[in-house]
């Protein structure tokens, strides 16, 4: 997120610091293993869709080689009393997103993603709106399948996540290996069943 100028996230390290940390993690883990989350997108009297897209562009240009995916959400202030109270207490006049605004933002974000050559996979976190026409998919805020792919050999973590790592079956008479359609292959002839049922919000 980039709300440094507005001071909306007090106690959070500076944007420059967070970007450098992100790049460092990406170098160690690989750019497919580190996901950029801009969560949530907030509208106020001083933050418009144009402003949000400028913020996204600034970060995206810096992270284009450090990640493959951007996950975002729209701030639903009315559903979170504490957030609503904090904004009002700090005299921050917020605006709620409606479907028209969400659609406009999604369209322009997808256009920016293509125009600037980022080619990020775009996904929402905990949103009901369907904006797949812009190539934006529903996503979990925390991707359990990605965690499993990165740490499948950590038996304690897999037990906590209730993920069963299974051995690939032997080939059939015709050389085919049959696994469930929602199975995800792992190294060492292992696989697991995806827990990633599309997030409907």
Where are these regions (language model features)?
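Conserved AdoMet/S-adenosylmethionine-binding subsite of the radical SAM
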Residues: 1-108, 112
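C-terminal accessory extensions appended to soluble enzyme cores
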Residues: 99-201
């Amino acid at each position: 997120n980039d709300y440094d100028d507005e001071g909306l996230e007090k106690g959070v390290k500076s944007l420059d610091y967070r970007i450098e940390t992100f790049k460092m993690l990406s170098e160690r883990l690989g750019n497919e293993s580190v996901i950029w989350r801009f969560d949530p997108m907030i509208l106020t009297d001083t933050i418009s869709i144009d402003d949000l897209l400028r913020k996204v562009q600034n970060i995206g240009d810096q992270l284009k080689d450090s990640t493959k995916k951007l996950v975002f959400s729209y701030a639903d202030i009315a559903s979170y009393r504490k957030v609503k109270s904090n904004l009002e207490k700090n005299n921050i006049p917020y605006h709620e997103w409606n479907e028209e605004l969400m659609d406009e933002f999604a369209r322009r974000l997808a256009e920016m993603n293509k125009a600037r050559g980022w080619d990020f996979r775009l996904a929402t976190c905990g949103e009901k709106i369907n904006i797949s026409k812009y190539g934006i998919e529903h996503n979990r805020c925390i991707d359990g399948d990605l965690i499993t792919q990165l740490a499948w050999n950590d038996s304690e973590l897999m037990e906590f996540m209730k993920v069963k790592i299974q051995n690939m079956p032997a080939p059939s008479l015709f050389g085919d290996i049959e696994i469930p359609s929602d199975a995800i292959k792992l190294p060492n002839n292992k696989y697991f069943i995806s827990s990633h049922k599309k997030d409907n919000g």
